[in-house]
Amino acid sequence: MLIVVGAAIAGVLIEAFLPRRSRYAAQLTLALGATVAAIAAVVVVVRQMPGEIGRPAVMGSVVIDRPALFLQGTILLVAVLGILLIAERQIPVNTENGGAAGGLDAFTPQASAVPGSVAERVATRAGVAQTEVFPLTMFAVAGMLLFPAADDLLTMFIALEVLSLPLYLLCGLARRRRLLSQEAALKYFLLGAFSSAFFLYGVAMLYGYAGTLDLRGIAAAVAEDTGTTSLALTGTGLILVGVLFKVGAAPFHSWIPDVYQGAPTPVTAFMAAATKIAAFGALLRIFYVALPELRDDWRPVLWAVAILTMVVGTVTAVTQTDVKRMLAYSAIAHSGFILTGVIAENRPGLSSVLFYLFAYGFSTVGAFAVVSLVRDADGQEETAMTRWAGLGRRNPLVGAVFSLFLLAFAGIPLTSGFVSKFAVFKAAGEGGAIPLVVVGVIASAVAAYFYVRVIVLMFFTDPPADAPQIVVPSGLTTAAVTVTAAVTLALGALPQPLLDLANGADQFLH
């Protein structure tokens, strides 16, 4: 985590002191190098605690245990893929108006310029590259690493803000459809500020109840209390609002479709995967470490949230006509599926959620990476489903890869999604949540319809006369898509090594 923070600060210094022409290479090298070094550090720490559940660190505000390390490793792997997509700077084909037809640079050359203004067109013609996105991404990654490892609520809130603030900025930096991007950033910021306020108010209530912000101290206070727990339950509910907002669970999901659609697609890919991983890690730690004694009170609430999330996500996705919005509602539905593992409240439930987050993170990055390649003649992303007709016929490789990710989301056998859903449903069934499993299976069947609909559209429908083009990416995006597709297939065919790793990380430090 300190490696990532150091890289983020160094990235800010690069922006301040390095010539513009040298920044891109320096920022990319620094971001990738720091992320890979952080992965190596996680591996070293894991090897140093063979028979140990975990230990506190940083004066007890952070805990280093196996679930935290698993989640941090997953976030860092997803971050590497996200940085590859964010770094894509495919050379555009110049057009008469200074546009970038065929180019894959997702970020505006001058964020402060009014969309469509002369200043923006001049910056585009000059080939100005937005390199501030790299330190912003690294700050977001640092917050994500801290969020699931925080051992007190104040540290958790700080992590929440550190991961959120850079994402608010990144969402508003799209090169094309600037107004839509800025609208998405504003919505995300306003709703995110409200959710953070709810979280902080809940922290204050739990502090008033327990007299401590430490998660284990809160657990001890609840266990020793023989009176009313209404203050603790109210605080828990408010904290739950803040965390469920980040995972995109209903009814706190309204920001997801607009933000996923308006944000630059590489940012959407990174945010959709990494934020969900970090937020679910924090949710698990809160309920499994601080509030296990209140399980009879919070489980019914999560039951309702999980069912509502699965229903809203799947039913609304069926009606979508935009690929990015369809994937956004798919992400909402997957939050409901993951919540079934959280509700299990047992060690298989924890390990199944860890596996699901790993598999889902890779598939999500890959799916959005493919979306970023489909462009019209002016270089705009083509996300209307009708424009994807015949895409698989014209480019079988791209169609096949995107179909693989959709089949994984649907939970089809021999993909990572099947193993993920089977694991969480099995754990929920063992935890007594059979009705929830039934709802999950039905929701998965409904979800399969809109995934297969896109596959049929790509391979069995005639393309339009002015069909969109597939932009050939550089090695950065190609590497990201290749790795995510390989992992999606590998976890479907040979999931046991990762399942064993997740089973070894199925216990928090209490």
Give the ranges of each region predicted by the language model:
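Alpha-helical transmembrane segments of multi-pass membrane proteins predominantly involved
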Residues: M1-H510
